[in-house]
From Swiss-Prot:
Disulfide bonds join C35-C63, C42-C56, C46-C64. It holds the Pfam family Defensin_beta_2. This is Beta-defensin 41. It comes from Mus musculus (Mouse). Has bactericidal activity. Keywords: Antibiotic, Antimicrobial, Defensin, Disulfide bond, Secreted, Signal.
């Protein structure tokens, strides 16, 4: 059992962690921060005057501009 655990940790460290370091642009993205940078607001529903750009954190909230 320890043998399997050792190889699982080794495989995880060799694949997942190195891929995260090599390609940081594919990591997690803070969509709320991206919305604020583009002068948007995270709301449940956009008004008629606002334009819905993307989702914020949850699929139910939208970035409205």
């Amino acid at each position: 059992m320890k043998f399997h655990l050792f190889f699982f940790i080794l495989l995880f460290g060799a694949t997942i962690l190195t891929a995260k370091k090599s390609y940081p642009e594919y990591g997690s993205l803070d969509l709320r921060k991206e919305c604020k940078m583009r002068r948007g607001h995270c709301k449940l529903q956009c008004s008629e005057k606002e334009l819905r750009i993307s989702f914020c954190i949850r699929p139910g909230t939208h970035c409205c501009m």
